[in-house]
């Protein structure tokens, strides 16, 4: 099997296409103007090539009840073609896997971060036992795209051999930088970039979007329920407004500092960052819960003002606010 995550997308041949970096290198970062591309997506037009993401298919008559029992999401009443996001947690409640997908009546189709499907399928495969489900990675055959629509922007799964035809119908093409800038501004975390091995869903705003609180038991539920009931998760996701005079962005994982001189201490790390066409340079970061909201932090020598994404008191008595 080829590795589409390392194979450049055919859409990199479109006019103005510039490849991304790191795990995002197989797709276009932009097509000449990431600011204009952000405005295009905000207007409800255009699409984003996400064909470097992994795609899996889960088939069999017991697939939804099986997923319901293993994950944080409620699958029993999932409507056909309704997209949903689910997590698989460790026994201690830490996020190990994340995926988004929909059911077409015969199979559940999901996509995950580039290169993440192998570990996800390995774990799922060990949970099959006598359950009537079949697992397959289908990244060779299917590609992911994001389609901006005025009424309901959504992901599309496209036969990989038809990507160029899809682009002609769904255009104009917008790059990953535009997609990421808008995602960051919404305060939506990206798994494995804005999270680490200790992340619990309560810290990053996944209660609701990816964690259903009214369902049966699943691995890691005790931690999620306890923190939700008592409030005050150990850390919180925050949106950083970076100093616009610096013509650079912090790398994922860069340490976030508070204080000065001998009183300087590490209070978290930066994940995703981007240049937003209105907000300027922004980033998502995980910081300790007790970091004062009004304090300006520092990352890679740049001042960083905070905007609340996850309330430090979030829990049963403080509901998360959708941005």
Q: What are the roles of these predicted feature ranges?
A:
Residues 1-84, 94:
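Acidic, proline/glycine-enriched N-terminal capping motif
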Residues 2-5, 11, 99, 204-211, ...:
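Glycine-rich, small/acidic residue-mixed loop/short-helix segments
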Residues 34-43, 86-98, 129-131, 265-269:
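Short amphipathic beta-strand starts and helix->beta connectors
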Residues 46-47, 55, 94-189:
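Acidic, low-complexity central loop/insert segments
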Residues 47-69, 136-149, 232-243:
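Short glycine-/aliphatic-rich beta-strand segments at the starts of folded cytosolic domains
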Residues 62-67, 117-121, 161-169, 246-252, ...:
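Short, conserved charged micro-motifs
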Residues 143-151, 185-200, 315-323:
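Short, low-order "capping/linker" segments at domain edges
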Residues 158-241:
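Anionic-ligand-binding alpha/beta catalytic cores of soluble enzymes and soluble regulatory domains
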């Amino acid at each position: 099997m080829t590795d589409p995550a390392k194979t450049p997308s055919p859409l990199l041949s479109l006019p103005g296409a510039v490849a991304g970096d790191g795990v995002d290198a197989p797709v276009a970062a932009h097509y000449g103007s990431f600011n204009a591309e952000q405005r295009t997506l905000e207007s409800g037009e255009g699409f984003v090539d996400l064909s470097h993401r992994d795609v899996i298919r889960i088939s069999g008559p017991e697939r939804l009840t099986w997923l319901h029992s293993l994950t944080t999401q409620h699958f029993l009443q999932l409507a056909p073609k309704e997209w949903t996001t689910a997590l698989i947690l460790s026994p201690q409640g830490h996020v190990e896997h994340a995926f988004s997908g929909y059911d077409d009546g015969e199979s559940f189709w999901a996509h995950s971060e580039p290169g993440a499907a192998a570990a996800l399928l390995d774990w799922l495969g060990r949970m099959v036992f006598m359950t009537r489900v079949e697992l397959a990675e289908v990244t060779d055959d299917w590609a992911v795209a994001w389609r901006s629509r005025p009424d309901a922007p959504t992901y599309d799964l496209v036969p990989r051999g038809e990507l160029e035809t899809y682009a002609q119908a769904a255009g104009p093409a917008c790059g990953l930088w535009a997609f990421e800038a808008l995602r960051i501004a919404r305060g939506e975390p990206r798994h494995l970039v804005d999270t680490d091995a200790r992340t619990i869903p309560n810290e990053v705003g996944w209660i609701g979007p990816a964690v259903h609180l009214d369902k049966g038991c699943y691995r890691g539920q005790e931690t999620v329920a306890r923190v939700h009931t008592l409030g005050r998760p150990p850390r919180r996701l925050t949106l950083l407004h970076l100093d616009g005079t610096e013509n650079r962005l912090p790398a994922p994982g860069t340490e976030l500092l508070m204080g000065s001189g001998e009183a300087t201490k590490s209070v978290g790390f930066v994940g995703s960052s981007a240049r937003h066409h209105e907000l300027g340079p922004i980033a998502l970061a995980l910081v300790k819960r007790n970091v004062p909201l009004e304090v300006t932090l520092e990352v890679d020598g740049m001042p960083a003002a905070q905007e609340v994404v996850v309330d430090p008191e979030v829990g049963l008595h403080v509901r998360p606010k959708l941005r």
